[in-house]
């Protein structure tokens, strides 16, 4: 992909121009809908695991270079810092009217490119992490309960014109829709309730077009669901849990791709273990939490350390308030546990997921589950906030690396001044961590965006998702609630599809 020659980005240290010029792109008009949301890296992280000492953070990507203030053509503000040559546009901002006549909900969170129509139009489904309150959407919007304000919105984005074409409420009346997962056939988004509030704690399926049924998938478990990664061949769902003592789960549908017919819920267990195994990385605070619940302490883990795993059935996947929780049931059967499971993404036979405050420093772990080998491996652990600050949502980039959304509040000095805002951080298959983008949102008084003014640089990134050809990255700012579309010379670095003169294999099967 090449950018227009008249938009070279920044001069050294200067802001990039506030416009998107796509006139030289060759874009098909219309076309049939195709599957999306399936990044296909060439390799897993075996190269990294073979040489764990090489896993390190670079201050600047040697391929993409420094980050510069880059202006948004819609707001006129430098909301993001990006490498030279990259451009973006904001859209779908909280409180702006949607196509169905209702205000855009706040708290943008998990998201996925669910379908693509030719090479021009992209269908996104986006979560809104809202709790109690009035459901959003016009009359007729599918609503789970009448006292919850969370849900999902669908958006159609025109790549050729870099603008939002249409958006609407697709699910409402749910509670704290945090992350979720894309259906690999491009049919739907699976939205997760991150709560165990009475009557909530389920996952819901939302179609690319139209609206959801608002029927919870009860047999997939009632717990603080965070994210879902769907394996292509089997249709199995791999799910994270956001809790201090959190399981990692597999849901086997009775009928492939028909989630509402139910299925079997299982929890991951370290094979041949004599009881629960604590994989929190040995942090003292988290070990105290485990001990208080009668669970074993964790220990520090080596980069590349791996565990052969198996799965145990959960007897009661939809427990009532007086019943043992899903995690308690699994732990009683020897299940493994983490701390605050967050983002998850499937690609080429592996599920990658994060533990946002896992590890000795409580700044985050990144795990890989090799489905065929049934082996779980620690591929990264952050030693401090500057290296990686509590990874949350995650996606696999077309070039094979991971892109991690930070949710640690930014990095501040002793005087509480920002050293840097929250970042989108790349992790290459060679084990190098590097900054790709930085939250630079500072909104002037009297000109609110999403109902907010002031310094928002510490607010989290969420919902990172690429188009299948790798030319566009869509990502959310949780608060004030903005969706960004980013494009540029991806092929220059490890996130891009083109590497060393060769194209990454698109085949998702090994």
Residue ranges of each PLM-predicted region?
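N-terminal secretory signal peptides
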Residues: 1-23
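N-terminal export signals
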Residues: 14-20, 26-49
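Beta-propeller domains
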Residues: 78-95, 99-107, 115-121, 125-163, 294-378
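Signature of short aromatic-glycine-proline-rich micro-motifs recurring in repeat-based ectodomains
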Residues: 103-112, 334-343, 390-393, 450-468
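Loop/turn-rich, solvent-exposed surfaces of beta-rich toroidal or solenoidal domains
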Residues: 356, 386-432
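Conserved blade-ending motifs and adjacent loop-strand segments that build the rim/top face
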Residues: 380-392, 433-463
